[in-house]
Curated annotation (Swiss-Prot):
GO MF annotation, one: triose-phosphate isomerase activity
Source organism of the structure: Methanosarcina acetivorans (strain ATCC 35395 / DSM 2834 / JCM 12185 / C2A)
Complex and partners: Homotetramer; dimer of dimers.
Gene Ontology biological process terms from the UniProt entry: gluconeogenesis; glyceraldehyde-3-phosphate biosynthetic process; glycerol catabolic process; glycolytic process
Protein name per its UniProtKB record: Triosephosphate isomerase
Catalytic activity field: D-glyceraldehyde 3-phosphate = dihydroxyacetone phosphate
GO CC field: cytosol
Enzyme class name: isomerase
TM regions (residue ranges): none
NCBIfam families to which the protein is assigned, alphabetical: PRK04302.1, tim
Amino acid sequence: MGSPFILLNYKTYNQGTGQGAVEIARACRAVSEESGIEIAVAPQLPDIYRVASEVELPIFSQHMDGVGAGSFTGHVFGKCIKEAGAVGTLINHSERRLTLAEIEASLKAAKEFGLRAVICTNNVPTTAAAAALEPDYVAIEPPELIGSGIPVSKADPEVVSGSVEAVAKINSGVKVLCGAGISKGEDLRAALDLGSQGVLLASGIVKAADPKAALEDLIRLV
Ligand code: G3P
């Protein structure tokens, strides 16, 4: 398999807010350059432009809506996040769930604006359904393990391998990420050994005392 993809979601953690968003992005950029591994960040929406202006690395939005230009007050417009500097977006994160129709509309809008789309899911059947929509990635994250420090790749390996198998049957062009509790080198290694092509993670890096050191530990067994 090729080099993994690592996507770091800042959520609304204090450490990843404002100037902190830039500092963590700098750490990601440094580790990405040293290792050759693609590391992307998903800061809060108002920080996208700030991070993009100061650090050269792939930036994802934490959410976008399936709306076009016009009368959509309070919505996240794909053109706006793209112009702010994002190259992709999460869709349907378990902390920002959407209806099936909304997922489909967000994905359509992401494609229209040339944004890479990661549809988040919570089990094998929803992963299979998401893959049928043909996003760039699906990210399987059992909600009960999110933020727990217990890695999905060790606590529930079947949900990762089951997702990989289900996606391969539906559309082998869709890449599978996994997430929840991932923070250490052995967690990422186990995720890759189960067939995933990368990880979506948050607290283990964003809340670490030294995010750069935490990232270096994360990739040490790749
Ligand atoms: O989006 C990533 C996420 O939900 C996993 O969070 O803190 O368990 O790495 P965490």
